[in-house]
């Protein structure tokens, strides 16, 4: 009997109650990181998330000094051993009350779209490798949601990145062989928010407007001019649109983008330093090998045994190439900031071009 072909995940369907729980938890602990577990089921490639619960955070006492303590316990909570036991116990209790008790991933909060980091990568790698391969990471950004639209996204690690991360192959040669780019780290899945039929019908009842009373026909011109509708015009000037104040969200994103670009420059400088060190050592090895060959040629004429030519491996030590993983994650984060700025910059740039003549009168004169 042939095995049933596995359908790849194509979308994520989240219950509205789960969304409200995630928003509440992330808003309560903002701006610190909030993490939790999500449960549900996989239905023909659509991951249906029906329940969630937060992870407890074990605070390290201030008087204790552990060298291996995580700098952010909440961010590392999904893969903590204590929380793994806690999650299994919670899922067992949910199963006893006939609730969907399949582990389908975890959720985390982000600030200004800053979620592409090692904690998120390690947590999702742990879930896809140890828990369940068909798991997702939900990322909720309270700062972005405060702008008026819900920011809830679902991500998975690509199979290509999973293989490279498992073997820790992030050198330049390995990345060229596997053709792994920073765009291949995360795979985003579309998110759909689902309501029950009862809630949907209730929302439609709330949206039902009151019946409008028939308008009275004005009897004279004076009555028409005194009407409150005559004093309101759609074409009235709105001077608020001329305000040149930049959105604080956009300003903060620009600052974070500059910080990420500076980090990228630092990573590039470190890699260039490695290349220079490698070139110096290789030049020393080449000079040593040439000298040893000349010595062996002289010894051959004197009918003496040759000296070993592989002794340079003991005398010289080539520098180890730094991992390119941090640089890849930072590049992916730069792309994330650039997309966010691109979505907010349209209204501001229009105002800047409108006042360009007053700011730079010399260009207008030319």
Curated annotation (Swiss-Prot):
Pfam families (alphabetical): eIF3h_C, JAB
Name recorded for this polypeptide: Eukaryotic translation initiation factor 3 subunit H
One of the GO BP terms on file: translational initiation
Regions crossing the membrane: none
Higher taxonomy: Eukaryota, Fungi, Dikarya, Ascomycota, Pezizomycotina
Record-level Gene Ontology MF annotations: metallopeptidase activity; translation initiation factor activity
Source domain of life: Eukaryota
Complexes and interactors: Component of the eukaryotic translation initiation factor 3 (eIF-3) complex.
UniProt record similarity statement: Belongs to the eIF-3 subunit H family.
Organism this protein belongs to: Emericella nidulans (strain FGSC A4 / ATCC 38163 / CBS 112.46 / NRRL 194 / M139)
UniProt cross-references to PANTHER family, sorted A to Z: EUKARYOTIC TRANSLATION INITIATION FACTOR 3 -RELATED (PTHR10410)
Residues of the MPN domain: 12-161
SMART domains with a match to the protein in the record: JAB_MPN
Keywords carried by this UniProt record: Cytoplasm, Initiation factor, Protein biosynthesis
Keyword Cytoplasm appears in the UniProt entry: yes
UniProt subcellular location: Cytoplasm
Function: Component of the eukaryotic translation initiation factor 3 (eIF-3) complex, which is involved in protein synthesis of a specialized repertoire of mRNAs and, together with other initiation factors, stimulates binding of mRNA and methionyl-tRNAi to the 40S ribosome. The eIF-3 complex specifically targets and initiates translation of a subset of mRNAs involved in cell proliferation.
GO cellular component, one term: eukaryotic 48S preinitiation complex
